[in-house]
Regions:
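Conserved PLP-anchoring active-site segment centered on the Schiff-base-forming lysine
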Residues: 1-14, 26-31, 219
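A general structural signal for well-ordered alpha-helical segments in protein cores
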Residues: 10-17, 40, 69, 118, ...
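Alpha-helical structural signal in soluble globular domains
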Residues: 16-20, 46, 68-79, 99, ...
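Active-site PLP attachment segment
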Residues: 94, 101-160
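Conserved PLP-dependent catalytic core of the aminotransferase class-I/II
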Residues: 166-218
Length: 235
């Protein structure tokens, strides 16, 4: 009963993994390289015949690293054919182009609020034909996977936000802004740009020896909004 994930997952993945460890599962946490990437080779080293699940995020919310999910899925299929593959695509949905069928993952999770729809709504792609037990029993909603009255306003809003998005144009615009920001930031003495930041919508930086809150206050006075930490990494 072996599971593989990464040390840089969202707590929505890390905390359940810790719970599983407490019940007897063995969990391997892959470590990122200096740019925040998890490589296929590192995953291959961790795969075992008794591996039953691999969960790797598509895009890291802090470094902007984009993981090679499709290649990882292929590696899992070869080395551990009985294992399921899940990817947290919350930061990748409509930010990094992908098609579920080409990606090959068994499960893909996304969230509405990342594309300006209402909080509290999301979606789980389940590969057709994949037999999964019910998460909640009851009225049989959501194809018997998750019983309970659906949040129809949230679902409709999520659908409308998807329909109203021009992903190709948005990605190009965000990538242009990211590159411009990195170009200008690189000219500041002492500033360190962190990670590969391959995602079009994320820029991570550090200004050693300066208090982050003071920097944020200055930026906000000019209408620029930033964060000095993320609640996703707090204990």
């Amino acid at each position: 009963r072996h599971i593989i994930t990464t040390a840089v997952e969202h707590h929505a993945v890390l905390h359940p993994m810790q719970k599983l460890e407490a019940t007897g599962f063995e969990v391997t946490y892959l470590q990122p390289d200096h740019d925040g990437n998890i490589t296929v080779e590192e995953l291959k080293k961790a795969l075992r015949p008794d591996t039953i699940l691999v969960s790797v995020m598509m895009v890291n919310n802090e470094t902007g690293a984009v993981m090679p999910i499709a290649d990882m899925v292929k590696a899992v299929r070869r080395a551990s054919p009985l294992a399921l593959f899940h990817t947290d695509a919350v930061q990748g949905f409509l930010k990094v182009p992908f098609r579920a069928k080409a990606l090959g993952a068994d499960m893909i999770s996304v969230s509405a609020h990342k594309i300006h729809a209402a909080k509290g709504t999301g979606a789980l792609y389940i590969r057709p034909g994949l037999p999964l037990p019910a998460f909640l029993n009851g009225g049989g909603q959501e194809s018997n996977y998750r019983s309970g009255t659906e949040n129809m306003p949230g679902i409709c809003g999520f659908g409308a936000a998807c329909a109203d998005t021009d992903a190709k144009a948005d990605i190009a615009r965000m990538a242009q802004l990211r590159d411009l920001a990195r170009e200008k930031l690189a000219q500041i003495d002492g500033l360190v740009l962190i990670g590969s930041q391959a995602a079009p919508h994320i820029v991570n930086l550090s200004l050693p020896c300066l208090r982050s809150q003071g920097i944020i206050n200055c930026l906000q006075s000019d209408g620029i909004y930033a964060v000095s930490y993320t609640h996703l990494t707090l204990p």
